[in-house]
Amino acid sequence: MHRIFLITVALALLTASPASAITPPPIDPGALPPDVTGPDQPTEQRVLCASPTTLPGSGFHDPPWSNTYLGVADAHKFATGAGVTVAVIDTGVDASPRVPAEPGGDFVDQAGNGLSDCDAHGTLTASIIAGRPAPTDGFVGVAPDARLLSLRQTSEAFEPVGSQANPNDPNATPAAGSIRSLARAVVHAANLGVGVINISEAACYKVSRPIDETSLGASIDYAVNVKGVVVVVAAGNTGGDCVQNPAPDPSTPGDPRGWNNVQTVVTPAWYAPLVLSVGGIGQTGMPSSFSMHGPWVDVAAPAENIVALGDTGEPVNALQGREGPVPIAGTSFAAAYVSGLAALLRQRFPDLTPAQIIHRITATARHPGGGVDDLVGAGVIDAVAALTWDIPPGPASAPYNVRRLPPPVVEPGPDRRPITAVALVAVGLTLALGLGALARRALSRR
């Protein structure tokens, strides 16, 4: 009871912020984008598809460390995700008997259906969420009986037709995937009747140079408050536009989460508590050095030395880097573990609202010493505790400012490019490959 009280008190700070500090933008439901699949503009494939691999000497007979750390096997005594549908908004999924994803739509290729992963990313996240077991190895997803829908929303392999690559700045090269298309993908997934949406992507921009993301905010509000979907998002990885945020200033006790110190906004992560924002940890339980900090981080989960299922349905633990295979890592995969847990909870507690599912995950997390911080939020998730603890359900809806807003005014001038362009990254891909040049440029809604 003492632990629950500490978490409940600390969670009040997750959404509290000084009036003078930066806060997530108010949501305008009137900015909801249409439910239309397809890319923002015609695209073409420019790069060969990537495939995951394995590190030398790897063995997969035992469960991955992350499953053991989170108690996944014990959690399956209470729920397996049966009857729950999870939408994976990512780079697509290569379906296999062990990752039996179904087509949910394609926002990269007009002729696609979501069941193609040229980036070796969406398949990995989907397998962590709901990969099926096999007698040949110890891998199993968090919610192995959940239904998977794949929505391909971004890809490094595709670019707008006629776009020109910049050999001196690959980050400036247009690629498929934008905040506009992400917003449409969220609406489409919600309308397909899913119970959980996983978004292992992040866009970062400076506080001093905000972007127009009204369509994304409206789509998240629609998914959560209208369609009743739990939306889980990655906190993001450092690199490129994602410059690490400083720690809260201890001399300002009125700002315990450090809203006044935020320098880099991460979206859609900063829409917490409407979404569940997930940071990363390593095998020691310490926060991952690459995991973006912020007052919006809600919980954490494993993000290093990840084992998943590849395009053939076999275990993998590496991606090809410049100098050979490198371990799979990133907050993408931390988010996938939490989405799997959300699916278990939706099966076990079908009457709980999205806000109450999120409350159960955060209230039962292994909280840090101070109860909550900007690295791991309320702490590392505890699957069995979330499924079994007797705790109050919490408020039916998350406190969030939803109101109709006037159209945003974009000031012309020398800073116009930073205002209208951000990097939308599948958070895990860039880090794992060790190639900063893989960060994609994506236009926000003007």
UniProtKB/Swiss-Prot annotation:
InterPro entries: Peptidase_S8/S53_dom, Peptidase_S8/S53_dom_sf, Peptidase_S8_subtilisin-rel, T7SS_pept_S8A_mycosin. Disruption phenotype: Deletion mutant fails to secrete EsxA and EspB and replicates poorly in mice. Residues 64-387 form the Peptidase S8 domain. The keyword Acyltransferase does not apply. The gene is mycP1. It comes from the Bacteria. It is found in: Cell membrane. Its EC number is 3.4.21.-. Pfam families: Peptidase_S8 (PF00082). The lineage of its organism: Bacteria, Bacillati, Actinomycetota, Actinomycetes, Mycobacteriales. It comes from Mycobacterium tuberculosis (strain ATCC 25618 / H37Rv). Residues 24-43 are annotated as: Disordered. Keywords: Cell membrane, Hydrolase, Membrane, Protease, Serine protease, Signal, Transmembrane, Transmembrane helix. It is a single-pass membrane protein. This is Mycosin-1. Belongs to the peptidase S8 family.
